[in-house]
A protein has these predicted regions:
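Catalytic core of pol beta-like nucleotidyltransferases
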Residues: 1-12, 20-26, 36-95
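Short beta-strand->loop micro-motif that forms the acidic, two-metal-ion catalytic signature
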Residues: 31-35
């Protein structure tokens, strides 16, 4: 988590999926949503950076990156990805 915070300087990081719900299996990975400021440079808006900074951690992780405005604009839509993450996930980091 520290590596992601240093690399992205995110506003929020959420854990979502089976690990957040508590119904993970032996092959489950960590699913993370990284919410970056709208002003974040292009390289900090891509998941590729996450895989670079997490390389070597030996923890299976999927990372989705989005901007604050994209995330917040969809919160009111019950079936949207951000709404589901807020409802079922866990907030791990808030700046």
């Amino acid at each position: 988590m520290r590596r992601l915070i240093e690399a992205y300087r995110p506003e929020r990081i959420y854990l979502f999926g089976s690990k957040a719900r508590g119904d993970e299996g032996p092959d489950s990975d960590y699913d993370l949503m990284v919410v970056v400021p709208d002003e974040a440079p292009p390289e900090r808006r891509r998941s590729r950076l996450a895989y670079e900074v997490l390389r070597g951690t030996r923890t299976a992780t999927d990372v989705v990156v989005c901007t604050r405005s994209w995330f917040d604009a969809r919160l009111h839509l019950r079936a949207s990805f951000p709404s589901t993450i807020v409802r079922e996930g866990k907030l791990l980091h808030a700046a």
